[in-house]
Amino acid sequence: LTGKKVICLNMPIRQIKNEYDRGNEHIEWLKKNYPNVTSAEVNLTSIFEEMEHTYDNDIQDFLTMANTRARLRMTTLYAYAGHHKLLVAGTGNKVEDFGIGFYTKYGDGGVDVSPIADLMKSQVYALAASVGVTSSILNARPTDGLFADGRTDEDQIGATYDELEWAMLYIENKENYELNKNQKVAMQIYQSLNRA
């Protein structure tokens, strides 16, 4: 939308096929609709596997290795950004970044600019729909793509973004109405992550 040079990187690490295909579809849509957008693919699988062979087995739990993937991608983003004299743009929104801290420190949280950080998740969807982002992106269950088992953000967090956004706004707006059972669960999840 700005007309500035943009390079989209697809950085698969043993990526699940539908995640990989959806990412490529979105990159192709961006290139078709915005002449300032180019792309590159950097398959990081072999580098990640070398790290797995190097690390002691006892530290290779799901979360450690998921965060390792995010940090490997961040390093790659900065290699491209540095070479092309560009900035790394983040994709975190207000709910993820400031509401529950759902990002990897020095991974997807390691960015130069955060253009959608002040938008609630629902606003991100509205913005995406208004510029014509494809339905496969808009309708996909949000995932960070960092786990080999394909878990979604909701699987990891225990609540949907709609529920988390509701809880965040309930607190911000100093609401004071009686909560139903589902709202209480969502509020508990939100508050536990927000205070962490």
Question: What are these model-derived regions, one by one?
Answer:
Residues 1:
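Walker A/P-loop NTP-binding motif
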Residues 4-7, 14-15, 26-30, 34-46, ...:
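ATP/NTP-dependent adenylation/nucleotidyl-transfer catalytic domains that generate, transfer
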Residues 19, 73:
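Conserved donor sugar-nucleotide recognition element shared by glycan-biosynthetic enzymes
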Residues 23:
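Conserved SAM-binding loop
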